[in-house]
Amino acid sequence: MKSALKKSVVSTSISLILASGMAAFAAHAADDVKLKATKTNVAFSDFTPTEYSTKGKPNIIVLTMDDLGYGQLPFDKGSFDPKTMENREVVDTYKIGIDKAIEAAQKSTPTLLSLMDEGVRFTNGYVAHGVSGPSRAAIMTGRAPARFGVYSNTDAQDGIPLTETFLPELFQNHGYYTAAVGKWHLSKISNVPVPEDKQTRDYHDNFTTFSAEEWQPQNRGFDYFMGFHAAGTAYYNSPSLFKNRERVPAKGYISDQLTDEAIGVVDRAKTLDQPFMLYLAYNAPHLPNDNPAPDQYQKQFNTGSQTADNYYASVYSVDQGVKRILEQLKKNGQYDNTIILFTSDNGAVIDGPLPLNGAQKGYKSQTYPGGTHTPMFMWWKGKLQPGNYDKLISAMDFYPTALDAADISIPKDLKLDGVSLLPWLQDKKQGEPHKNLTWITSYSHWFDEENIPFWDNYHKFVRHQSDDYPHNPNTEDLSQFSYTVRNNDYSLVYTVENNQLGLYKLTDLQQKDNLAAANPQVVKEMQGVVREFIDSSQPPLSEVNQEKFNNIKKALSEAK
């Protein structure tokens, strides 16, 4: 079919369309809000930030990258097993040798590797979901997204429920300067078409996307916001960048613009004499990477594939941006009192070069380790013993860990799934932070090997080599649910699609040796964990996921 993304250019200027569209959307947004903005999850006392002493409080940076796989940072030798990875399928435009891929991946992250080596590597760290919106919601709330009915990006399309207390709200109420820079993807949004890009048809270029008022970052605890509201944006000439509530022009390469904004945040905090909490969410290396990065990044790579070079250069642009931020922290005297919590929002997609998710099975949007086991570390110079931490942890732990580091009490009515990691990292507490972690989500082939034909044709469309937008049979909405529960020994996986149950040792990265039949008691106990998780969670917010959710419940009921 002819491109569904082609747009008719109206005679009225885009700015007027955007203004009227935003006004109309805002006027009707209140009618669509299912959950009132009143906080029912936590009771705040009547105080002002000035009642709290912020002297000596640490600065907090929650730093995320978009679709960066576990294999992109050398956390352990198993994740870089060349024999396993050399046989992995990739989209044609990214095909290079495995040795070149590993070399380029390591070359793209010198600053991040240095921070990782100086901090604590979470070698068994997982995000709470395999796709962006729910995963980011878990970071912002410290809760599994299922607790508030979010099981996929579709459930998140109406915004994360306003009853949830976002992390910056607590920091803001305790005297911190709070800022969000980069990707938001936690709002109810609306779109306004813009003229088609003449060079590429990156789907992020097709619309200006903007958030409904209630879900604006400034209404969820941030003093300042600069970035984009939806799932992604173009690397150049983005039509969807906002500074607070006003649309602003793109300035060059998006990673550089976000880095400049982050430096502005740390400078303002210095001027205000306040500690800061910065949520810095880069969009790299999210697809598509058809446009080269600026030469200072691009010239570092020569893999034999232009698109692969673009990918690694986008990662390197973030790495060098972090380097600039660290230099500014040193200049301002903030460096020694700053914490960095780093993760990718989910695993890598098949539409990228190796090493992607390393030797692990699965990709973004799946509960296999390749979808949720991400590069993750915490850096706090002089306050943490460098090294690996190998117990099960979650990005949901960032929320209580950051508050604990700032000596901010968690309100008693706030029911978190995350726990502070400081007792284990600083006080050498025995045991593990989590006995189990549970995921329920769409089991989508959107980003795995099964969908390579779509991605090959998608690149042809993006580059104007074809006017036909390819059919995608593997979207989230067309996919059944699956569940996974992990403890510190096993991973139990069930997929409705093929009615398959598998039990695997965590060391079985490819999940080839199914131990379910030989360990019925382990299976029974882990299924009980999933039942308890469902009983304490909410049903999906979207209608499209209701039947899928019920199928999971039915399968668990029949397994008793």
Curated annotation (Swiss-Prot):
Residues 1-29 form the signal peptide. The conversion to 3-oxoalanine (also known as C-formylglycine, FGly), of a serine or cysteine residue in prokaryotes and of a cysteine residue in eukaryotes, is critical for catalytic activity. The active site is at residues 132, 185. GO terms for cellular component: outer membrane-bounded periplasmic space. It is an enzyme of class 3 (hydrolase). Its cofactor is Ca(2+). One of its GO terms (molecular function) is arylsulfatase activity. Ca(2+) binds at residues 66-67, 132, 345-346. Its EC number is 3.1.6.-. Binds 1 Ca(2+) ion per subunit. The modification 3-oxoalanine (Ser) is found at residue 132. SUPFAM superfamilies: Alkaline phosphatase-like. Keywords: Calcium, Hydrolase, Metal-binding, Signal. It holds the Pfam family Sulfatase. Belongs to the sulfatase family. This is Uncharacterized sulfatase YdeN.
